Amino acid sequence: MFCLDTNVVIFAINQRRPEIAERLDREIASGTPIIVPAIVLFELEYGCAKSTRPEQSRRALEIFLSVGFEQPAFDAEDARASGEIRALLESRGEPIGPYDTLIAAQARRRGATLVTLNTREFERVPGLSVEDWTA
């Protein structure tokens, strides 16, 4: 199972890194479960809302999501896991961004490998599998 980070979705939609879209197509064709967490959806919707072309951005996002990715809601267990991750990383002096903490918790709780271009940030999270499809 894979979990897509916001930057991966943006690159897939905009076709700026064709290797991401190609890998995504292969994983979808093979039936691999792929999730787009609630926090990623929030970040994408925010990007659409502040875009100079919000209608076009929103339509591109709708087309991308129409593939049928799992979109798990952020629940109480995700909140607990996020709090634990944030506290641990802060105690080590290695905090990551608050949204990244929430995304990491959703991926880790579901046993998903997080696909991101920001591996250095997410590799700090114990027990989280991370991949960069551009590497």
Feature names for model-found ranges:
Residues 1, 104, 108-135:
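Acidic, PIN/NYN-like endoribonuclease modules and their adjacent C-terminal/linker elements
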Residues 1-36, 49-64:
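Short, well-structured N-terminal submotif of metal-dependent ribonuclease cores
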Residues 5, 36-37, 96-97, 118-119:
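Histidine- and aromatic-rich ligand-binding microenvironments
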Residues 5-7, 44, 82, 107, ...:
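Generic structural signal for small/hydrophobic residues in well-ordered secondary structure
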Residues 55, 70-115:
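Active-site neighborhoods of divalent-metal-dependent phosphate/nucleic-acid chemistry enzymes
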Residues 65-67, 126:
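Short, structured coil segments at secondary-structure junctions
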